[in-house]
């Protein structure tokens, strides 16, 4: 778990529009909205420096955060970050309230372990991370910080799919409910381009020899 407390101090936002957003940025504030949880949406602002610090943590994007507003605390998850198209700026943050007894749908990062032990890697293959995060559904109390995928047994030309990913108790992958076509690969090992070219060249050579014999 992250050693940094996942907490944001918020203020109610009374002004809207582009001009108001520019004034907020000058005041080191970021516009945001907090919605869900059977309550009305609230337009708020967040402390830019505090937000920047938390955004350095992987857990910020997948874990439950505490928002302090007017002396009250709200539990939320980050649903969207709107970034400036070419400047390193966050222009708006969407936060969804979390209710203890209701499932949340969010994406968590995937941590790949034991890649150097994979037979496919030892055979000269190239590993490809098809998915770096996976959407899950669970109660807030069961929300994992990440999912771990062990690739130590992965062979050349094979893949680990969503259905192969070990899940903590109470966690499910909604994509799998939609059928086998949605059982996407998470990580795979393919032959390198050079190895593939060598194989193709060898195959062509064998075909040429067979033709000469005929």
Curated annotation (Swiss-Prot):
CDD domains: Ribosomal_L25_TL5_CTC (cd00495). Keywords: Ribonucleoprotein, Ribosomal protein, RNA-binding, rRNA-binding. Part of the 50S ribosomal subunit; part of the 5S rRNA/L5/L18/L25 subcomplex. Contacts the 5S rRNA. Binds to the 5S rRNA independently of L5 and L18. Residues 189-214 are annotated as: Disordered. The keyword RNA-binding applies. Coiled coil: none annotated. One of its GO terms (cellular component) is cytosolic large ribosomal subunit. This is one of the proteins that binds to the 5S RNA in the ribosome where it forms part of the central protuberance. It comes from Alkalilimnicola ehrlichii (strain ATCC BAA-1101 / DSM 17681 / MLHE-1). Residues 198-214 have a biased composition (Acidic residues). The gene is rplY. Pfam families: Ribosomal_L25p, Ribosomal_TL5_C. The keyword Acetylation does not apply. This is Large ribosomal subunit protein bL25. SUPFAM superfamilies: Ribosomal protein L25-like. GO terms for molecular function: 5S rRNA binding; structural constituent of ribosome.
């Amino acid at each position: 778990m992250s050693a940094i407390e996942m907490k944001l101090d918020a203020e109610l936002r009374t002004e809207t529009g582009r001009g108001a957003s520019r004034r907020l940025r000058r005041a080191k504030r970021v516009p945001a909205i907090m919605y869900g949880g059977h309550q009305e949406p609230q337009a708020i602002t967040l402390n830019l420096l505090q937000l920047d610090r938390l955004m350095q943590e992987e857990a910020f994007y997948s874990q439950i955060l505490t928002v302090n507003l007017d002396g009250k605390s709200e539990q939320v998850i980050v649903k969207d970050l709107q970034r400036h198209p070419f400047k390193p700026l966050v222009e708006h943050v969407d936060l969804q309230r979390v209710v203890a007894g209701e499932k949340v749908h969010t994406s968590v990062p995937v941590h790949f372990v034991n890649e150097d032990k994979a037979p496919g890697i030892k055979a000269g293959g190239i590993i490809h991370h098809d998915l770096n995060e996976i959407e899950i559904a669970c109660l807030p109390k069961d929300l994992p910080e990440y999912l771990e995928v062990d690739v130590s047994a992965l062979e050349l030309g094979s893949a680990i799919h969503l259905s192969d990913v070990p899940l903590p108790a109470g966690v499910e992958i909604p994509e799998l409910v939609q059928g086998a076509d949605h059982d996407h690969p998470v990580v795979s090992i393919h032959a390198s381009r050079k190895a593939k070219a060598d194989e193709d060249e060898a195959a062509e050579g064998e075909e040429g020899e067979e033709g000469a014999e005929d």
